[in-house]
Amino acid sequence: MNSTSTHFVPPRRVGIYEPVHQFGMWGESFKSNISNGTMNTPNHIIIPNNQKLDNNVSEDTSHGTAGTPHMFDQEASTSRHPDKIQRRLAQNREAARKSRLRKKAYVQQLETSRLKLIQLEQELDRARQQGFYVGNGIDTNSLGFSETMNPGIAAFEMEYGHWVEEQNRQICELRTVLHGHINDIELRSLVENAMKHYFELFRMKSSAAKADVFFVMSGMWRTSAERFFLWIGGFRPSDLLKVLLPHFDVLTDQQLLDVCNLKQSCQQAEDALTQGMEKLQHTLADCVAAGQLGEGSYIPQVNSAMDRLEALVSFVNQADHLRHETLQQMYRILTTRQAARGLLALGEYFQRLRALSSSWATRHREPT
Amino acid sequence: MERVRDLASEKAAVIFTKSSCCMCHSIKTLFYELGASPAIHELDKDPQGPDMERALFRVFGSNPAVPAVFVGGRYVGSAKDVISFHVDGSLKQMLKASNAIWL
């Protein structure tokens, strides 16, 4: 099992470095092409060219003449045919011109390949985010490098890809119906579907956390701008309320008060969970550093730290529970139409963060 | 079991915890933030701890056994329940009703 697992790590880990290898290889082939260039001919036409020169067919100007055989030929013939010097010089100029054109074409080709590579890298990133790496049924992760092959995580990445697609679809639908006319019963069913969709994400995350809580906590399944706001494997509900508050329809005084209370409750609960997490970090660090550091045997420390880590899963679940309850409470406070607007705003906020991530990721790659 | 009941009604807010439990720490923090000062009973420091843990699980269905929160002598629930009641505002009301907080 280990041989397959070590087999499986490199594709993902080394993925980042692959472009470098590619460029390295191209660099070498570029060098070899340059050295060919001094001979002014690509490899495959050297031989016919030489044959022609051996036969003294000097009218031929379609191929380069600056290579060593040419030089030899030129020196040998100048004394006997002085007018040939002019012809040779003209041929050289022509060959040089062609060489420059070929070099230009080659550089252009390199440039196109570079763009293609960038495109491929982006596709790879996207595919990775949607979880298209192959799960291979390995279910142990005792060596800690297994998040890439944990089948539970592979399934989660796949599911999350679908989840985002479905969310995009729901946002489109909400946008359309809010601009048109729709009765409250239909609108309510759309709103409830959108809420259920978020709850479904919490369920998915909970089983993924069981499979590998570090993966869920790392936010690797989200885009980079979304990760920037990460708090215990997701968004801070109070942050979202802050962002969304100006985008609701006009709220009554009572609603405004309720939303402010909710925001405060969220902040308090977030603080409480954060403090618990801090305590977990402290006890974990104490656990790992227990006994004498540097004596070489640390199996008991690692084992007791493993027990402490179990608590991490409950923090991810509790944070999602807070998100769940906050959504529910918002829905209680708002009317159906307000809730629909809120969910649309929330969904579009996530869409914009995802768009920001991809713009940021490609900013240096624009051809200059 | 008797001891759980006695301790639970000793003060307006009571939390059974374990010293090693980080989620307990979170729930304690939440109560302090609300202005309450709950009585804390650490089961792993109490000689009758294991018995009380079993009682919490058996009688109140508290799973995991800690944190187990009581307000006004009545069982409120585990961490998850406390967060639910906190978000919908009812925890604050419970605390007020049993004079654990005044504001």
UniProtKB/Swiss-Prot annotation, chain A:
Region of interest: Leucine-zipper: 110-124
CDD domains tied to this protein: bZIP_HBP1b-like
Domain DOG1: 153-363
Effect of residue 266 to S: Gain of interaction with NPR1
Domain bZIP, chain residue ranges per copy: 82-145
Disulfide bonds: 260-266
Subcellular location(s) per record: Nucleus
Coiled coil (UniProt feature): 83-131, 261-281
GO biological process: defense response to bacterium; DNA-templated transcription
InterPro entries: bZIP (IPR004827), bZIP_sf (IPR046347), TGA_domain (IPR025422)
Keyword Nucleotide-binding in annotation: no
Pfam families assigned to the protein according to its UniProt record, in alphabetical order: bZIP_1, DOG1
Function: Transcriptional activator that binds specifically to the DNA sequence 5'-TGACG-3'. Recognizes ocs elements like the as-1 motif of the cauliflower mosaic virus 35S promoter. Binding to the as-1-like cis elements mediate auxin- and salicylic acid-inducible transcription. May be involved in the induction of the systemic acquired resistance (SAR) via its interaction with NPR1. Could also bind to the Hex-motif (5'-TGACGTGG-3') another cis-acting element found in plant histone promoters.
PANTHER family referenced in this protein's UniProt entry, alphabetically: TRANSCRIPTION FACTOR TGA1 (PTHR45693:SF64), TRANSCRIPTION FACTOR TGA9 (PTHR45693)
UniProt similarity note: Belongs to the bZIP family.
Name of the protein this chain belongs to: Transcription factor TGA1
From Swiss-Prot, chain B:
Top-rank lineage group of the source organism: Eukaryota
Keywords linked to the UniProt accession: Cytoplasm, Disulfide bond, Electron transport, Redox-active center, Transport
Listed CDD domains: GRX_GRXh_1_2_like (cd03419)
GO cellular component, one term: cytoplasm
Location, primary (coarse class): cytoplasm
Subcellular location: Cytoplasm
Family recorded in the similarity comment: Belongs to the glutaredoxin family. CC-type subfamily.
Role according to the record: Has a glutathione-disulfide oxidoreductase activity in the presence of NADPH and glutathione reductase. Reduces low molecular weight disulfides and proteins.
Record-given protein name: Putative glutaredoxin-C12
Biological source species: Arabidopsis thaliana
Gene designation per UniProt: GRXC12
